[in-house]
Amino acid sequence: MLDINYIEQNLDEVIQRLNKRNQQDYSDDLKYVVSKNLKRKEILVKSEALKSRKNQLSKEIGTLLKEKKVDQSEQAKIEVINLNEQIIKLDEELRVVNDQILEKLLYIPNLPHKDIYFGKSDEDNVEIRKSNHSNLLKHSTPHWQIATKLGLVDFEKGVKLSGTRFLIYTGLGSKLVRSIADLLLKRHEKHGYKEIFCPLIVNKSAMLGTGQLPKFSEDMYQVGEQYLIPTSEVPLTNLHANEILAYDVLPLKYTSFTQCFRQEAGSAGRDTKGMIRLHQFNKVELVKIVHPEESMNELEMLIKDAEDVLNMFDLPYRVVELCSGDIGFSSAKTYDLEVWFPEQNKYREISSCSNCTDFQARNMQTRFKDKDSKIKLVHTLNGSGVAVDRLIAAILENYWDGEKLILPTLLRPYFDNQEFIK
């Protein structure tokens, strides 16, 4: 969430920057938060004054008892009882005001970075660069048809077992998922990421920490009081919640391959066929926890790490900077990597790399000691490295020659050095 003191001191600027998101007008919510924060400060001043008076009286009572001034000490005790009642009442008022502030803040998104492109939707995103790779085979068969023809995926049985937007990888399809995940994790390990094998179920505080809750609750799968992860960004970023890290341990870089789960509540009618939009999907995630002054440089390196995956497979792709109206809730700045799908004749997102600045860190209370031993919030970044199902779909469409799937060279050792699947 945002820093309430920054909001209070820079209200007009915060309103202006948030309104660039083109999602809603946050003016009333922000003014409400500021007014409640002033109320909170008033309560704290009153409470501290009462506590100070109570402490003073407690000392006086001891002195009065020593001097055997019983009547005066009894009067002081009565005043202490009254003060306690007032303090309890103020504490309850403070709890209510804090809850009111938190309830609003948790629904207010991160500030877009000051140099971000202004735009209303994904149509206003800006292409930064394209790869030099091209679709060599020039065939345009839908990936789901190729997957079915080769027996790599059973879409019908996925629906039979679990419903729409579920699938089953079979035979060489299962091996394809496993080999790609292994390949990606090894690559990211070489780039300094530490592999984590993390839980697929997390508690509510973890979801609050990264900003999935409360705003996106309808998109989450809930298991009792816990949640299936929508991405391993959630457990990886929360690894250091409520911790104060030493200066020299940063940056921390984590990677994980997991299944991810999303309701896709707002995606009715979109990508109903194939492997692009699933309720359960496979992804290799990249997370960084860094010094604030290094976060923008770390974002550029994060993009390069994700690009490296697509370059490994010689897939055509482009890098797009998201405009102010398209960035995610917790993000200050985001770049998408989009891979070419010849059958659709367009680029589709396969990785999203974001700098969340101190937005998530404030929720999680993940801090570090700077060189002067001052406690500060870290910055957090995350990116797909990459979405495995979408990568497989892109390989199917870009490496299909009309009769067989040409296996990318670096995958062949996993398939007994065979050159194609037919």
Swiss-Prot record:
Task: List the SUPFAM superfamilies.
Answer: Class II aaRS and biotin synthetases, tRNA-binding arm
Query: Which first-to-last residue range defines the signal peptide?
Result: none
GO BP, one annotated term: seryl-tRNA aminoacylation
Q: Describe which pathway this protein belongs to, using the record's wording.
A: Aminoacyl-tRNA biosynthesis; selenocysteinyl-tRNA(Sec) biosynthesis; L-seryl-tRNA(Sec) from L-serine and tRNA(Sec): step 1/1
Q: Name one GO cellular component term.
A: cytoplasm
Binding residues annotated for ATP, in chain numbering: R262, Q263, E264, E349, I350, S351, S352
| Protein name from the UniProt record | Serine--tRNA ligase
Q: Which organism is it from?
A: Mycoplasma capricolum subsp. capricolum (strain California kid / ATCC 27343 / NCTC 10154)
Question: Encoded by which gene?
Answer: serS
